């Protein structure tokens, strides 16, 4: 999947979380972030902190790869 916007990241996180049958509360606790932060992330809010986003992605088994194409 190509990520171009914060909405793309949010959608990927939400879809993956649901596929893993995790609630927002469970994933937030696992990632040591607040549920409000996770909700904002899943809704594409552009002011999210990248470190927290990466923690959440790691706990979902996702990785971020950057290419210079």
Model regions: which residues?
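Recognition helix of helix-turn-helix/homeodomain-like DNA-binding domains
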Residues: 32-46
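DNA major-groove recognition helix of helix-turn-helix/homeodomain DNA-binding modules
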Residues: 51-66
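Residue-level recognition of specific faces of alpha-helices
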Residues: 12, 26, 37-40, 53
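A generic secondary-structure micro-motif detector
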Residues: 3, 14, 42-43
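A detector for short, charged/polar N-terminal pre-domain segments
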Residues: 1-8
């Amino acid at each position: 999947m190509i990520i171009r916007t914060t909405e793309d990241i949010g959608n990927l996180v939400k879809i993956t979380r649901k596929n893993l049958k995790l609630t927002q509360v469970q994933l937030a606790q696992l990632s040591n972030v607040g549920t409000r932060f996770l909700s904002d992330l899943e809704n594409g809010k552009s002011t999210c902190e990248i470190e927290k986003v990466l923690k959440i992605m790691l706990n979902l088994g996702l990785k971020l790869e950057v290419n210079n194409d």
